[in-house]
A protein has these predicted regions:
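PLP-dependent amino-acid enzyme catalytic core
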Residues: 1-244
Length: 244
């Protein structure tokens, strides 16, 4: 929806957000002292929710809309496991069956993440797997393939297209995911107001972009509409930079 500046959060999603939101905005006095800076430094802590990351902010509305459309299953890929865990949790709350393909090498390195997904009732497979044609083709060509997000996405999409009443979900990158994540920045804006502050700089990590957008976009609108001069910094990994 690009026609409206504001889109209501469905009441049922708001109720589930209330399980863990709002998340803390914390002033980092120790960091200020260590840097010997006159600046006031705040950080928005999204790790305090049940899944430990911002991903649940989008998993809940995605599962809500799938349920509204009559779906019974959701599928996705996950790398480190944060999105897979979030989707598994949200699917459980909405009575959906979740199937998660996790990058095989990551699944081996982080076994507890897949345990969390299974705790919430999800089916979890290391990708590439033998459960899809895409996975079988990859393993046939390269039996020791460590997996990648590309292999996991291929398998998740194949399952979604071959399973009745099943939707493929994605935890970052897409417009609707960034929209869901703006709950972070909208909260931060109100919390800064309560503290009597307004940011000169907004800094956020940038992987797929939804966390950065979620924090930054609500403040960006004041630059556009109200003449604010806030600077926005996307902190990307040097190993796989998405912007530069």
């Amino acid at each position: 929806d690009t026609q409206h500046a504001w889109i209501d959060i469905p009441e049922e999603v708001r109720d589930k957000y209330a399980y863990y939101r709002s998340t803390p905005l914390v002033r980092a006095y120790g960091l200020e002292e260590a840097l010997d800076t006159p600046a006031h430094i705040y950080f928005k802590n999204e790790s305090t929710n049940p899944l430990g990351s911002h991903k649940i902010n989008s998993a809940l509305p995605q599962c809500y809309y799938c349920k509204q459309e009559g779906d019974t299953n959701v599928t996705t890929e996950t790398g480190a496991g944060q999105w897979g865990a979030a989707l598994s949790y949200a699917a459980k709350l909405y009575g959906l069956e979740a199937a998660v393909y996790q990058v095989k090498i990551s699944m081996q390195q982080k076994p507890y993440r897949s345990a969390i997904m299974r705790t919430f009732g999800a089916t979890v497979e290391g990708s590439p797997s033998m459960s899809t044609r895409a996975g079988k083709d990859i393993i046939t060509r390269e039996p020791n393939h460590p997996g990648s997000l590309g292999t996991a996405i291929s398998e998740a999409i194949e399952l979604a297209t071959t399973t009745p009443h099943c939707k493929y979900t994605l935890g970052s990158v897409l417009n609707h995911v960034a929209l869901h994540q703006t709950v972070i920045g909208l909260e931060a804006e109100k919390q800064m107001e309560m503290a009597g502050e307004y940011p000169d700089e907004v800094i956020a990590c940038f992987g797929g972009g939804s966390n950065f957008g979620g924090l930054a976009f609500p403040f960006m609108r004041h630059n556009i509409l109200d003449g604010k001069k806030t600077t926005f910094v996307a902190a990307e990994p040097s190993s796989c930079p998405k912007l530069t």
